[in-house]
Amino acid sequence: FSWDRIVERHGHLAAIRESMLGLDDLPPATRLALIAKLSDTLAQFVVARRWLSSDRAERIVVEARDRSAINLATRSRGDETGQLVLHLRATGQLTAGLILRALLSGNLELFDRALVELSGLPSHRVAALLYDRGGSSLDALLTRAGLPSSTFPAFRAALDATNEIGFVGTIDGAARLRRRMVERVLTRCEADPDVSEPLLILLRRFATESAREEARVFCDQLVADVIDIAPEHQRIAA
């Protein structure tokens, strides 16, 4: 049987989706296709109820899909990441916005693989062009990959920030660092009079999302600390 065929024919059925999403060995590309089906179903529902406009519902769906793609790519290993990139390209989801989100999220493997796929260049050549500090090589690579030139300043600023502040491995650290990355890129792009307004709008959305995620992680950690401390206080009181 084919996972893709099942998703295509029955992915709109909640029972089928839930059963498949509960499988530990479900390929990431198939999992993302199911998430896309669910997102489309929810978008159609809220638009039909006139709770959201079709434009806003579509934007929310795209952002949710992109976040899911980044999360799945982070948990993928080896060929799974490559298959996920192929799926993203085949479904029109391998966009400049997704690739920029991957870079700002610290997922350098997805970022590199996406550019390898879109440019048609071998991975070692892409790596050499990406990290050539001259600047023109990066523009040439992004152009070959078919990304809009209006997004180049953000990619350049993000790579510079990556080289300057790097990434750390903990969940909490990644949240803080991601916010620093986004804010640094946004600040640099806002200072450039040639940067397009749509790019600034996208970066501001990323900034809001990263700040919200950092606050969530902080609150989760605070609650966990309180839970850990409570039994000790009870023993002392006794």
Q: What are these model-derived regions, one by one?
A:
Residues 1-238:
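Alpha-helical scaffold segments
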